[in-house]
């Protein structure tokens, strides 16, 4: 069981689209992939084909067994669990994370958690084999937050693998190019890859789909395939 947590260092970094596209990229290897929406302000299901009017999710149920009724499967075979209508009848995100252990039907299973930006990293029940990706954009706010996070991680002596992943990178922007070069040279834990800004990601969502399905020859497809391969490599090192 491989657990990947993805969280924006602030709101609007594009975390949910990464979760959806990454899930579909991993699924291409014909392994079980689960995507869990922990964000009350997110809409992971929309990226994976869920009907616009669907409102129910795990937060509408008192226990995990009944919440499993809301698991859906997209055309690629990704199983996903929406957040729901925010009624919170008894479950919280920590119990959902822990309860997913019950679904672990294979050592090759991947569990991707779409985490809300406002919940601090240290509130998640993380294990030493977990990988936590904190999503950043090339702007001054993320730059400030990333170095603050780095200091907090050092003080907490975190045991999990923590990385900063750059999303929506625009190579035509001088500021973004300068920031990315600075991070790559001076920011520890920066992932050795980034996701380029690509209009197809937004267009795919309008069709309730992901970029790697709508535009298999796009830059976005290459980026998510690269991200999936890198995570497979990181997870394999954990298993050794």
PLM regions and their residue ranges:
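Anionic-ligand binding region
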Residues: 141-162
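Glycine-rich phosphate-binding loop used to anchor ATP phosphates in small-molecule kinases
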Residues: 103-122
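Beta-strand-loop-alpha "switch" segments that mediate conformational coupling across diverse proteins
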Residues: 168-174, 180-215, 224
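P-loop/Walker-type NTP enzyme "switch/lid" segment
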Residues: 9, 32-107, 206
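NTP-binding/hydrolysis catalytic cores, primarily Walker-type P-loop NTPases
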Residues: 211-240
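Walker A/P-loop phosphate-binding motif and the immediately C-terminal alpha-helix
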Residues: 2-40
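Conserved beta-strand segments of the P-loop GTPase G domain that flank and frequently precede/overlap
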Residues: 36, 82-83, 112-114, 133-138, ...
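Inter-motif core of Ras-like GTPase G domains
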Residues: 120-140
């Amino acid at each position: 069981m491989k657990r990947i947590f993805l969280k924006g260092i602030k709101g609007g970094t594009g975390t949910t689209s990464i979760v959806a596209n990454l899930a579909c990229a991993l699924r291409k290897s014909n392994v079980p992939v689960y995507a869990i929406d922990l964000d009350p302000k997110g809409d992971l299901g929309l990226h994976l084909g869920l009907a616009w009017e669907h409102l129910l999710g795990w937060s509408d149920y008192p226990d995990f067994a009944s919440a499993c009724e809301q698991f859906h499967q997209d055309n690629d075979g990704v199983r996903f669990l929406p957040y729901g209508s925010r009624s919170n009848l008894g479950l919280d995100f920590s119990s959902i994370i822990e309860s997913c252990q019950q679904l672990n039907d294979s050592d090759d299973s991947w569990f991707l958690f779409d985490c809300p930006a406002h919940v601090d990293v240290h509130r998640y029940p993380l294990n030493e084999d977990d990988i936590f990706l904190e999503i950043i954009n090339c702007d001054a706010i993320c730059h400030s937050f990333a170095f603050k996070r780095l200091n907090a991680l050092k003080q907490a002596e975190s045991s999990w693998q923590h990385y900063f992943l750059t999303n929506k990178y625009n190579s035509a922007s001088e500021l973004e190019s300068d920031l990315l070069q600075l991070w790559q040279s001076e920011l520890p834990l920066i992932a050795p890859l980034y996701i380029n800004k690509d209009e197809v990601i937004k267009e795919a969502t309008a069709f309730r789909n992901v970029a790697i399905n709508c535009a298999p020859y796009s830059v976005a497809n290459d980026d998510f395939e690269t991200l999936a391969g890198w995570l497979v490599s990181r997870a394999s090192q954990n298993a050794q």
